[in-house]
Curated annotation (Swiss-Prot):
Protein task: Transcription factor; part of the gene cluster that mediates the biosynthesis of 11'-deoxyverticillin A, one of the dimeric epipolythiodioxopiperazines (ETPs) from the verticillin family that act as mycotoxins. 11'-deoxyverticillin A is required for normal conidiation. Directly binds the consensus motif 5'-(T/C)(C/A)(G/T)GN3CC(G/T)(A/G)(G/C)-3' localized in the upstream regions of the verticillin biosynthetic genes.
Alphabetized InterPro entries for the sequence: OAF3 (IPR050675), Zn2-C6_fun-type_DNA-bd_sf (IPR036864), Zn2Cys6_DnaBD (IPR001138)
Gene Ontology molecular function, alphabetical: DNA binding; DNA-binding transcription factor activity, RNA polymerase II-specific; zinc ion binding
Residues within the DNA-binding region(s): 117-144
SMART domains with a match to the protein in the record: GAL4
Protein name, as recorded: Transcription factor verZ
Major site of localization recorded for this protein: nucleus
Gene3D superfamilies assigned to the protein according to its UniProt record, in alphabetical order: Zn(2)-C6 fungal-type DNA-binding domain
PANTHER family the record matches: MONODICTYPHENONE CLUSTER TRANSCRIPTION FACTOR-RELATED, OLEATE-ACTIVATED TRANSCRIPTION FACTOR 1-RELATED
Disordered: region residues: 153-256, 435-458
Biased composition (Polar residues): 167-186, 193-207, 223-235
Any GO CC annotation of this UniProt entry: nucleus
Keywords for this protein: DNA-binding, Metal-binding, Nucleus, Transcription, Transcription regulation, Zinc
């Protein structure tokens, strides 16, 4: 059997004519029925506004909030654009507006609240704005409060009207600006607490006069500030009658009867008033006069300079010159002032008499000074040949640079040996020195501010 090839033709059934007529008239019937029911139940008019429902108060409350944010009167906007609405919804909107602190009659803007709660704002984190409490406040179990937003920067200055600047006749002081409160008249009548209005004259700042080198004053009337009251204090003498003249009591009573005026703060102490005070030198002289009269100050005693003749005894030096330094006491001190002059030979021999002693004090033979000698004198030993430390003890001169102690003849630890040409830099820098001679004393001493020479008597 051979199979068929090609597509098979399908014949669709055609609906009967009755059903076609019913489907065409169905749409028309539905429209007619809709119009009939609308006419019967609607009174022939379509409703302009929707009927109030349970959701209308909430819808209009949010609309009222948006209207209040832009600053429009809520009641007028509802009456003009929304028409007559449910009284319950209008009462709800009015109550909400009253809670926000906004008056419908005035139409003022209410306070602006923060977008984040106070807790999140303080922590500087993003607030989730969940209601009634955000997630962070709910977690910490604290109250979620939205505070009033504050304007950043400096606060705005309050504008005062010009009516507040007018002064009252009872003398009250108003807190207005200085420019509006100042009077332009030259001689105003200041406000008095006693009811009187005296004319006060204040002196202006003095004007310098270059001709005589003095300072002159220019007295003229000065404008008074409205905030500067004057006190009228009348001090009357008990014996003064009502008709008595004020001049009879002298200028003191006249000055007491004059009104006392509070001058503005611009007036400083005038130079004429400053010149009325005596100078400082005269004040010190007046202060010193009674002190001088009670306790006269005597001249200070003059400081006597060391006189070498005061140290010279009555007797002259006698005996061998070998015992020149044998009479040196342990505690004897010789001061060397800077004003010492060059001594001659006779004065040097007289100075030797101070150091005479017997041979028993050989272990404590020394002469010392308590005054600082650095930069005043220096020392040198001349004529002591063949002398040295540990070699020959004849004719040696030891100078101790340490503290003043009892130094024996054999103790050399605190002393330095002086030869023919010694180095005296360390000795000159010391504060105290001691001289000790063993066997061959010097026969002559010469002293000047720069050098102390010890020589043999050849």
């Amino acid at each position: 059997m051979v199979p068929r090839t090609g597509r098979r033709k399908t014949n669709y059934a055609v609906p009967p004519p009755v059903l076609q007529l019913a489907s065409g008239w169905s749409a028309l019937v539905v429209c007619l029925l809709h119009l009939l029911f609308s006419f019967l139940y609607g009174g022939g008019q379509q409703p302009i506004h929707p009927r109030p429902s349970s959701r209308l108060p909430r819808i209009f409350s949010f609309a009222d909030r948006d209207i209040m944010r832009i600053g429009l009167p809520t009641q007028d906007f509802h009456a003009e654009h929304l028409g007559a609405i449910d009284p319950s919804s209008h009462h709800h909107m009015s109550q909400m507006a009253g809670q926000n602190g906004i008056s419908h009659a005035q139409g003022r803007r209410g306070p602006k609240y923060r977008t984040s709660c106070d807790r999140c704002q303080a922590a500087k984190v993003k607030c989730g704005h969940e209601k009634p409490s955000c997630r962070r406040c709910t977690y910490h179990k604290v109250e979620c409060v939205y505070g009033i937003s504050r304007r950043m920067g400096r606060p705005r200055a309050k504008k005062n009207s010009g009516k507040d600047a007018s002064p009252s006749p009872q003398g009250s002081i108003n807190g207005a600006s200085d420019e509006n409160s100042r009077s332009k008249s030259a001689t105003p009548a200041p406000v008095s607490f006693t009811g009187t209005e005296p004319i006060t004259e204040a002196r202006q700042s003095p004007v310098a006069n270059a001709e005589g080198g003095r300072i002159s004053r220019a007295e003229s009337t000065q404008r008074a500030e409205p905030w500067t009251p004057s006190l009228t204090t009348n001090f009357e003498h008990p014996e003064t009658s009502e008709g008595a003249d004020d001049s009879a009591h002298g200028p003191m009573m006249q000055s007491m009867n004059t009104p006392l005026t509070f001058l503005p703060t611009e007036n400083r102490m005038e130079l004429d008033d400053f010149n009325d005070y005596p100078p400082m030198s005269s004040f010190m002289e007046d202060l010193a006069d009674p002190m001088m009269s009670q306790q006269p100050i005597s001249a200070p005693p003059s400081l006597d300079i060391l006189d070498p003749h005061a140290l010279i005894p009555d007797r002259t030096p006698t005996g061998n010159t070998r015992d020149t330094f044998n009479q040196v006491d342990t505690g004897l001190s010789v001061s060397l002032p800077q004003t010492t002059q060059l001594w001659n030979t006779s004065q040097a021999h007289q100075l030797h008499a101070l150091f005479e002693s017997n041979s028993t004090s050989k272990s404590k033979r020394r002469a010392s000074t308590g005054q600082e000698i650095s930069g005043i004198v220096s020392f040198n030993s001349v004529g002591h040949s063949n002398s040295g430390f540990g070699n020959k003890r004849m004719g040696e001169l030891q100078i101790a640079t340490g503290p003043l102690v009892s130094i024996g003849a054999g103790e050399q630890s605190a002393m330095m040996n002086i030869g023919p040409n010694p180095d005296t830099s360390s000795v000159a820098a010391s504060r105290k020195f001691a001289m000790e001679e063993e066997d061959d004393p010097c026969s002559e001493i010469k002293l000047n501010p720069n050098r102390l020479r010890l020589e043999d008597g050849k």
